Amino acid sequence: QLPTGLYKKVLVILHDSILPYMNEPTLMIDFLTVAYGIGGAISLLALNGLFILVHQHNLEYPDFYKKLYSLLDPSIYHVKYRARFFHLADLFLSSSHLPAYLVAAFIKRLSRLALTAPPEALLMVIPFICNLFRRHPACKVLVHRPNGPEGMSEDPYIMEEEEPSESRALESSLWEIQTLQNHYHPDVAKAAAVLNQSLSEMEDDISGLLELSACELFDKEVKKKAVDVPLEFEQVRGLFGKKNDIFAEHFTLE
């Protein structure tokens, strides 16, 4: 068991400064699997190395997706390594051969956690979820279930369930995304409203959104130029004498 600080220093550089120069990268399997099981930021950082071993060296990691699913907690939208995590999660969930229940569980948990996420994270995760729907059409029952019940007394999805197959995600619906359609940030509300329509076949490019920050959003809003200057919340329809005219209620020519 290494100190947490040392784990982080090694894992940050492992995938590009250590593994490519090893004659037998598979020797790092035990180290990475132990690090992946620790949890928190260390598990997130271990994903990079594991990704290389799984895809380039045929590493078999039992319950890999169960562990990846367990990493989804409220902090995932706030951690320093958020961009790296979602980049790798996007790669791991890119296969069209993944079972629908597994992808639905990821979609549902990401959506539930999104209810308390900051706008900069929401503008990234909503297109991320849309891409999962494009890859796995069977999950679209979460937004459109033709033969489903008219209403539900409660959400069947079990957020606390650690096993994705037992979470009952496919029986649920994405009411969380519908809630985000009323978000205070107009860009978030607009992004969430995309699911009200048929999705295009082409995936959204989220690479430019992974490292989006609150400062960038603020600067974007500050630099916006208003087309119409907001002078009054109720437009004047006339001057004196017209029925129900606000100006005439307070002033008179007499």
Describe the predicted segments one by one.
Residues 1-95:
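Extended alpha-solenoid helical-repeat scaffolds
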Residues 58-254:
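Eukaryotic scaffolding regions of large macromolecular assemblies
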